[in-house]
C-alpha cells in the first residue's frame, strides 16, 4: 500500500516536472530571424505596435550576432515610439548607439532618440528636464550629422524647444511680478533676452523688464529697455504699453 502511494506521488511529480519542462521548451524555441522580422513588420502594418516591438525584441535575444539584429533593434525602437512608449524607445536607442556607433543608420538613431524626448515634453507648468534632454539630443544630431535631413529638422525642433523653455521663464517671471518681487522677475526676463532672443517671447520679456524696473523705481533702466523695444519692435503693442508706462511716470 505504501509502495503504491509512493509510486503515485512520483508519477504526479514526474508529470508536473514534465509539464514545466514542456512549457519551458516551448518558450525557449528559437525562431528563424526572418520569421520574427516578418511577423514584426506585419504587426507594424496592422498598427499593433507593442506586439511588433516584442517580435523585433526577440531577435536581439535569440540572434544577437546576426547582421539583421541592428535593424531589428531600430525597428523595435520605432515600434515603441509609435506605441507612445517613448522612454522605452530611448532605452533601446541608447543601447543601439552604444553597440553600433558606426552603423549606417546611426544618424537616424540619434534623431529618433531626440524625437522621443521631444514627445515627452510637458507643459510649462511642470518640470522641464525632458525639454532640456530633447534640446541636447537635437544638438547632438546637428553636431554629429550636420549634412543630413535629420540635422535640418533638428534645427527646426530646437526653435520650438527654445520657445517652450522661454515660455516657462516668462510664466515664472510673471508670477514674481504678481507677487511684487521685481528683482526675481528681472532674472527670469533677462534669461529670455540672453538665451531665447529668437523666440516670440523676447518682445514681451523686454516690456516686462520695463515694468519691473518701474516697480523698483529705476526709471533710467526702464527707459533703456523702452528704447530697445522701440528700436526692434516699433509697431508692437508691447512697445506701446512700455511707452505709455514711462510717459505716465514723467507726467
Curated annotation (Swiss-Prot):
Membrane-topology descriptor: Lipid-anchor
TPR repeats: 33-66, 70-103, 166-199
Domain of life from the UniProt record: Bacteria
N-palmitoyl cysteine lipid attachment residues: 20
Lipid attachment site numbers (S-diacylglycerol cysteine): 20
GO biological process: Gram-negative-bacterium-type cell outer membrane assembly; protein insertion into membrane
CDD domains (UniProt xref): BamD
Record's keyword terms, sorted: Cell outer membrane, Lipoprotein, Membrane, Palmitate, Repeat, Signal, TPR repeat
GO CC aspect terms: Bam protein complex
Primary site of residence: membrane
Leader sequence residues: 1-19
Protein family per UniProt: Belongs to the BamD family.
Known function: Part of the outer membrane protein assembly complex, which is involved in assembly and insertion of beta-barrel proteins into the outer membrane.
Quaternary structure annotation from Swiss-Prot or TrEMBL: Part of the Bam complex.
Protein name as it appears in the record: Outer membrane protein assembly factor BamD
The species this protein was found in: Rickettsia prowazekii (strain Madrid E)
Protein's gene: bamD
Amino acid at each position: 500500500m505504501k509502495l503504491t502511494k509512493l509510486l503515485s506521488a512520483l508519477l504526479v511529480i514526474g508529470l508536473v516536472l514534465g509539464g514545466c519542462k514542456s512549457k519551458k521548451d516551448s518558450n525557449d524555441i528559437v525562431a528563424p530571424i526572418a520569421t520574427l522580422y516578418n511577423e514584426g513588420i506585419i504587426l507594424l502594418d496592422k498598427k499593433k505596435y507593442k506586439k511588433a516591438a516584442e517580435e523585433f525584441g526577440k531577435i536581439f535575444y535569440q540572434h544577437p550576432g546576426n547582421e539583421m539584429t541592428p535593424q531589428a533593434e531600430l525597428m523595435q525602437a520605432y515600434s515603441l515610439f509609435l506605441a507612445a512608449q517613448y522612454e522605452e524607445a530611448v532605452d533601446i536607442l541608447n543601447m543601439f548607439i552604444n553597440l553600433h556607433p558606426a552603423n549606417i543608420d546611426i544618424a537616424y538613431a540619434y534623431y529618433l532618440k531626440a524625437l522621443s524626448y521631444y514627445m515627452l515634453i510637458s507643459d510649462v507648468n511642470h518640470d522641464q528636464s525632458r525639454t532640456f534632454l530633447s534640446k541636447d539630443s537635437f544638438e547632438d544630431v546637428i553636431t554629429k550629422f550636420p549634412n543630413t535631413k535629420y540635422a535640418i529638422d533638428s534645427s527646426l525642433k530646437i526653435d520650438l524647444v527654445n520657445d517652450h523653455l522661454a515660455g516657462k521663464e516668462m510664466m515664472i517671471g510673471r508670477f514674481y511680478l504678481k507677487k511684487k518681487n521685481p528683482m526675481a522677475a528681472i532674472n527670469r526676463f533677462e534669461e529670455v533676452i540672453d538665451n531665447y532672443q529668437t523666440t516670440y517671447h523676447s518682445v514681451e520679456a523686454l516690456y516686462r523688464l520695463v515694468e519691473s524696473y518701474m516697480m523698483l523705481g529705476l526709471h533710467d533702466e526702464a527707459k533703456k529697455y523702452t528704447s530697445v523695444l522701440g528700436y526692434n519692435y516699433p509697431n508692437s503693442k508691447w512697445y506701446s504699453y512700455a511707452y505709455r508706462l514711462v510717459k505716465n511716470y514723467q507726467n
